[in-house]
Amino acid sequence: MQYPTVAQVVLDGPDARKLAEFYRQLFGLRYRDGDEPPPDGEPDPRGADWLVLRNPGGVQLAFQQVDQLPEATWPEGEHPQMLHLDTTVPSVAALNKQHERVLALGGRLLHDRSDDPEEPLRVYRDPAGHPFCVFVHEVDPETDRS
């Protein structure tokens, strides 16, 4: 049997370029050809519509411009999240390093469980209000499929 393949995860936001830049810098991704930011002062028609970040060997991220997007009120509230990204790092030291990067890039800390001995993690909100997680997960490439 053949199954569909996930091609990309699409995140809506009121500023697609700003959101794409946040994730490009956070994950070290590159733009799809033609989606790169224009020179300063030039119009950015693609940035006001749809952008794609390539992730060699993984699922790509796309960003769609919307007029309004209420922030998700995680973990409960009027605007529950519909999707979030789970990302991993190999150690608590790496978790702490990424914490500084996320904040410097404009992310906001929502929940800090970095001292949890079983699964250290932090939950953040990206510049458009989407929650995402960074947690410690030591991967054994021979056995791990998560």
Give the ranges of each region predicted by the language model:
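Short, flexible helix/strand-to-coil boundary loops that buttress conserved ligand/catalytic motifs
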Residues: Y23, D67, H99
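Vicinal oxygen chelate
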Residues: T5-P14, A48-N55, V59, A72-Q98, ...
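Short, compact, well-ordered microdomains
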Residues: A93-H99, L103-H137
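A short, polar/charged loop-to-alpha-helix boundary motif
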Residues: D140-S146
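Core segments of cupin and vicinal oxygen chelate
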Residues: M1-P4, V10-L61, A104, D112-D115, ...
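Short, solvent-exposed beta-alpha or beta-beta edge segments that form flexible loop/patches at the rim
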Residues: A62-P70
